[in-house]
Swiss-Prot record:
One Pfam family per UniProt: Shikimate_DH
Residues annotated as binding NADP(+): G203, A204, G205, E206, T207, I208
Naturally occurring in which organism (per UniProt): Actinobacillus pleuropneumoniae serotype 3 (strain JL03)
Domain-level remarks: Possesses an unusual extended V-shaped dimeric structure with each monomer consisting of three distinct domains arranged along a curved 'spinal' alpha-helix. The N-terminal catalytic domain specifically recognizes the glutamate moiety of the substrate. The second domain is the NADPH-binding domain, and the third C-terminal domain is responsible for dimerization.
A Gene Ontology molecular function term of the record: glutamyl-tRNA reductase activity
Gene that produces this protein: hemA
Protein name from the UniProt record: Glutamyl-tRNA reductase
Coiled-coil residue windows: none
Broad enzyme group: oxidoreductase
Amino acid sequence: MTILALGINHKTASVNLRSKVAFDDQKRQLAFEQIQHRALAESVVILSTCNRTELYFHNAEITPREEHEDNIAWREQCFEWFAEIHQLEHNELRECIYFKQNMEAARHLMRVACGLDSLILGEPQILGQVKQAYQYSENFYQSQNSHISTKLSRLFQRTFSTAKRVRSETEIGSSAVSVAYAACGLARQIFDNFGKLRFLLVGAGETIELVARYLIQHGAKNIMIANRTPQRAETLAERLNTPMQILSLSALQIGLNQADIVISSTGSPDMLISKEMVEIAQKQRQFDPMLLIDIAVPRDIDENAGELDAVYSYSVDDLQHIIQRNMAQREQAAEQAAQIVDEECKAFFEWLKQQQSSDLIKRYRQDAEQTRQELLAKALVALTSGQDSEKVLNELSYKLTNSLLHVPTQALQAMAKSGNSQGLQSFSKALKLEEQ
């Protein structure tokens, strides 16, 4: 039995190549069907994000020994299929792809789900993406009146509980390490209740979208967006499914006069909010506390605005200091998280070994039972036909003993022939022959 992780990520491949191997819904469905048709795996889970594409295969028929020719051939078949479905040259792909098996594959999956392998250390979104990937796989196999193999399913369930444990036992996700989240975290330190505050966001790009999502998530209800192109701001509001007041840049003063918190991130080469504009706004607001966070480079907000009474002003440089401090905390937490992953990975493989021994014992008992029933049936026929009962029973016991000992005897002879003294000793110890 082998679990194989095959993939590429932001560490091994460019954005261009990562985009070529991404799985949309249609290609994911095709992949499931092809893998099943070609018998590449008993089950597979496909994880596809902007930073990684990884497939987790479980094949019960493949030996776990990586150097074995069957294992090597299977890996190559998986690789060739992966190149084929994405219509890529082998050479282009081979330089960027990685294979991890069994213990390393399980550890890698757990590290991925915990955010330890992410571009932004500890980012929480990846766990949801791993769960969604598992759900896609589960849905496919259910549609085929089947299910994900027990061992692969157990690995993913263990992974989810490991990620939950990492979040609860470490500080890996407690501090912001992106500019957008750091800005919002700073706002939460200064103001308590976002639901009662008025926000002015200047710009409508990716950073402002992240800021808006964070604010909404933490209860913000009153948001204005000012942008050079109002239509882009309207599109952002629609995408966030949240009513927002849209302003043009020429109406910035109107927004400032109402805002408790201003967060700005545009690509403008010119300053958009002067100290004088903030001063006018403060008079309108009766000098209630105002927070200005300027994420833009070059600046959108006059750096001297912070000299005004009740105005708190922060720049992107201030946020970078916060991020560096938080990143150091996350790196320390990541060491704790890695220890948890190792513990959980070992625990999973202990379960797997127990499961494999249980399966082996079950098959051995089934074979023995089949032999018993076959010989018993022959003995009953002989007794019914009037043969001597003592002779029939002796023959039954003799044949049963020979049948049950035939395979173990062959194994002993093979070990003796190959000079496997350790195997012979273990066999003798298991059968308690040394004590006799």
